[in-house]
Regions:
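Histidine/lysine/aspartate-rich catalytic loop segments that bind and position anionic ligands
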Residues: 26
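N-terminal, charge-rich interaction modules
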Residues: 1-18
Length: 119
């Protein structure tokens, strides 16, 4: 599953990192506590959050996330956008509430990967 597929399917507004929409999304992570995201998210994850400050860019870059989705119409702060553009981190915005956005992203990724062989 590629980031551009999720952007199109969910009609996400891309505010930075347009050049990286071809990144492969390997999984997802949901969280607003940066230490939790740093400890538990993985490379290639699509991070879903309400946080809008510039530290989200640092975490996404450090963890090599596929991108960040900001939910409930949260727009990134100006310094966040500047940093994301400089570092090429894709940030997308949706008006969807978190539960809906998470469910849709999960279904897209799970369907693309196929059934879990461990179940």
């Amino acid at each position: 599953m590629y980031l551009e597929d999720i952007v199109k399917a969910l009609n996400l507004r891309v505010v930075s990192g347009e050049e990286r929409l071809t990144a492969e999304v390997l999984g997802g992570y949901v969280g607003d506590l940066l230490s939790d995201v740093m400890a538990n998210s993985k490379e290639g994850d699509l991070w879903i959050t309400r946080q809008t400050h510039q530290n989200i860019v640092a975490v996404a870059s450090l963890k090599d996330h596929a991108g960040i989705i900001l939910i409930q119409g949260c727009n990134p702060a100006a310094d966040t956008l500047d940093k994301a553009r400089k570092e090429g981190v894709p940030i997308m915005v949706t008006d969807m509430p978190g539960f809906e956005a998470i469910g849709k992203v999960y279904n897209m990724i799970a369907t693309k990967k196929g059934p879990d062989p461990s179940t």
